[in-house]
A protein has these predicted regions:
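A short His-aromatic
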Residues: 1-2
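A short glycine-rich, Lys/Arg-flanked "PGG" loop and its adjoining helix->strand segment in the class I
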Residues: 6-18
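Catalytic cores of large soluble enzymes that bind and process phosphate-bearing ligands
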Residues: 11, 65, 106
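Short proline/glycine-enriched turn/loop segments at secondary-structure junctions
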Residues: 97-103
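Short hydrophobic/aromatic beta-strand or adjacent loop that forms the aromatic wall/cage
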Residues: 104-112
Length: 116
């Protein structure tokens, strides 16, 4: 998680060449992590409860945890101007064609910003 995602977006757009494309593949993995029912064998199966709790606490300390994503991302990118943006909320189905131990049942999204 980024502590200052708005600043990150601004910097990424600043260094992007005109007509350059910014792709951000993300998901709100931690938002409802404590409520998710994961299979017994999963990518976090060997992570201690203490470490998972610490990650959860860090997530809730970050401002971005308060926002509805990817709507927030689009609003920020549009407010920063100089780009056209779109979101693909079905990208996770294509990335996770097979649900292996790394699969986390959280809808992924892809933000695409094209610099003017």
């Amino acid at each position: 998680n980024l502590p200052h995602p708005e600043t990150a977006y601004a910097e990424w757009l600043r260094v992007l060449a005109p007509k350059g494309i910014l792709l951000n593949y993300d998901a709100e993995y931690a938002k409802d992590h404590h409520r998710q029912k994961l299979p017994a064998i999963n990518a976090h199966a060997d992570v201690s409860a203490e470490l998972l709790n610490e990650c959860h606490n860090i997530y809730h300390m970050l401002e971005i945890s308060l926002f509805e994503r990817p709507r927030w991302d689009l609003e920020i990118l549009k407010a920063l101007g100089s780009c056209s943006c779109s979101v693909d909320q079905s990208v996770g189905d294509r990335i996770y064609a097979e649900q292996d131990i790394f699969y986390i049942p959280v809808p992924m999204f892809c933000i695409k910003a094209v610099k003017n």
